[in-house]
């Protein structure tokens, strides 16, 4: 099975592990000082956390689902685990109509759980119906980008695989 890998720098590993355990409903596959990784089955994702680095920016992260029921189930699970969400919104944003919910991690990275329901000619956010009238959008947010660092450069990995 193939899966996307996402490597994030975090300021507080314990807070990040707690958040991502709740976000994806699973515990880390590996934990070391300053490091944790998750082998997430659904959606297929390898999430790697490095503590303490600086630099880089990130607009947002997301999970695209197959239907609105999956967005609703995710929002219910996130809320019941104590994470603050925007609620479920029918939204026009980023040239699409969507059903979505958003949550923000301990370092300010925005996560969107959504299903695309159609196309749109509009980039900026318009909430058609639903929860938070101040909901987030995937359109650029120039005023306060999330800053994520880069892992320090190291010698090339051996032919046996990468660093993670």
Where do the protein language model's features map onto the residues?
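Conserved beta-strand in the GNAT
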Residues: 46-50, 112
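N-terminal beta-strand motif that seeds the catalytic metal site of vicinal oxygen chelate
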Residues: 1-14, 44, 60-61, 120-164
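Vicinal oxygen chelate
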Residues: 13, 62-110, 117-121
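Residue-level recognition of strand-loop junctions within catalytic nucleotide-signaling folds
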Residues: 11, 50-52, 66
């Amino acid at each position: 099975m193939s899966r996307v890998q996402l490597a994030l720098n975090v300021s507080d590993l314990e807070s990040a592990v707690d958040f991502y355990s709740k976000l994806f409903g699973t515990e880390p596959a590996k934990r070391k000082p300053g490091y944790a990784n998750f082998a997430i089955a659904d959606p297929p994702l390898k999430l790697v956390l490095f503590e303490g680095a600086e630099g880089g920016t990130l607009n947002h992260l997301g999970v695209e689902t197959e239907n609105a029921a999956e967005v609703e189930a995710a929002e219910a699970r996130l809320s019941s685990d104590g994470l603050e969400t925007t609620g479920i919104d029918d939204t026009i944003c980023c040239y699409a109509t969507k059903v979505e919910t958003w949550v923000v991690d301990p370092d300010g990275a925005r996560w969107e759980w959504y299903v695309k329901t159609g196309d749109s000619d509009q980039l900026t956010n318009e909430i058609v119906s639903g929860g938070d009238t101040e909901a987030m959008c995937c359109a650029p947010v120039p005023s306060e980008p999330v800053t994520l660092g880069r892992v320090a450069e190291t010698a090339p990995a051996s032919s046996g695989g990468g660093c993670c």
